[in-house]
Regions:
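Short, charged surface segments at domain edges that flank catalytic/cofactor-binding sites
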Residues: 1-36, 58-64, 160-163
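Histidine-centered nuclease catalytic patch
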Residues: 18, 39-72, 80-101
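DNA major-groove recognition helix of helix-turn-helix/homeodomain DNA-binding modules
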Residues: 76
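Domain-level detector of nuclease and nuclease-like folds
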Residues: 81-171
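C-terminal, charged low-complexity interaction regions
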Residues: 130-222
């Protein structure tokens, strides 16, 4: 999960209270969330939903409230449903959602699990951690088991880009300018607009040298 700034005004169509997923809503959400599912961080997912962060349950105000509409992939929306209705909010500027939950990437493309660990001991963080664990490690149906495996492989592919840069950065034969370029490329991988940025950010945060160097670039909403 990544930090988001909702810097777009409410799309005009919402004022009519007819549809909450008109084209202007989609366009605005795509910009605000960088075309990423706010839960799993998949970029440009094929199956997308306008999700109600708090289930509206027939409440017209919640149904058409711009601040309650989120960019979600169909899979995450299906798993979340109404059960997970008290999550930490990635659009809340008072909460650093990235640092609230540790994301550990899989060590191989077909690793059976990846680690999600709450860093704060409160109900919202624990529930969000539980949801993320289910998203990435689900085995509750055959379909979800297979799709979770595909998702972990995508995370690993992005992680592998970071591994290549780390190998270059820490090489005994690296030139100063090459080291600087590797560092700049790492900054691109931890930007909120990058896929699975939470996983790569945590790798950097836990590195004794790179953590202090890139700390100020991590978790900064775009």
């Amino acid at each position: 999960m990544f930090n988001v700034v909702r810097n777009e005004p409410a799309p005009a169509s919402l004022a009519n209270k007819v549809k909450y997923d008109s084209q202007d809503v989609w366009d605005a959400l795509s910009r605000v969330f960088h075309k990423k599912c706010y839960i799993c961080e998949t970029k440009e997912p094929q199956d997308i939903n306008v999700e109600h962060f708090f289930p509206h349950q027939g409440d017209e105000n919640l149904k058409f409230d711009w601040n309650n509409l989120y960019f979600s992939c169909g899979r995450c929306n299906n798993i979340k449903l109404a059960k997970y209705d008290d999550l930490i909010d990635c659009c809340d500027t008072n909460v650093d959602v990235l640092r609230a939950i540790k994301h550990v990437p899989p060590v191989t493309p077909y690793a059976k699990k990846l680690k999600i660990e709450a860093q704060l001991n409160n109900a919202k963080t624990n529930l969000t951690s539980e949801l993320l664990d289910k998203i990435f490690n689900s085995t509750h149906t055959p379909n979800k088991t297979v799709s979770a495996s595909f998702l972990r492989k995508k995370v690993f592919s992005q992680y592998n880009l970071l591994l290549d840069l780390l190998d270059e950065y820490y090489s005994d034969t690296v030139l100063p300018q090459e080291k600087e370029i590797a560092l700049e490329r790492m900054k691109l991988l931890v930007k909120p607009s990058a896929p699975y940025s939470a996983f790569l950010s945590w790798c950097i945060l836990e590195d004794d040298e790179l953590g202090p160097l890139l700390n100020d670039f991590i978790g900064v909403a775009e």
